[in-house]
Regions:
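Sec-dependent bacterial lipoprotein signal peptides
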Residues: 1-11
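Long, contiguous binding/interaction regions
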Residues: 13-119
Length: 119
């Protein structure tokens, strides 16, 4: 938690943490060692299987393991992208921007990421 507090105070930040910061804070509170690699899964939703497969191809080119399947609810398709990496705020924010732009370009939605706690 000290590292996250330092990052927030060094940036002069008094604003509410963004989505990625919030998840990192929750992981740290749960006892996760943020200096170790985590198996992080990112979630994108698309209106059709063809579009989800198109996104998956682009994401695979960036070194992610990707699976496409019908979403559990609704008529959308889930594109889940997994990568083992140290969860660093700047890297996660860049992925969010990149995946958000990709999803927007294909009429989809980027829905965040998750990872198990790593001790």
């Amino acid at each position: 938690m000290a590292l996250l507090t330092t990052v927030l105070s060094l940036s002069g930040c008094t604003k509410k943490p963004d989505m990625d910061e919030s998840v990192l804070i929750q992981l740290k509170k749960a006892g996760s060692d943020l200096s170790k690699p985590h198996n992080i899964e990112f979630f994108l939703y698309f209106p059709t299987q063809a579009v989800a497969e198109q996104a998956a191809s682009k994401i695979r080119d960036e070194g992610f393991h990707v699976e496409v399947e019908k979403a559990a609810k609704g008529d959308t398709w889930l594109c889940s992208a997994t990568k083992t990496m140290v969860p660093q705020l700047t890297s996660l924010q860049k992925i969010r921007r990149d995946f958000g732009a990709l999803a927007d370009s294909l009429n989809g939605e980027y829905d965040g990421w998750g990872t198990p706690v790593v001790k």
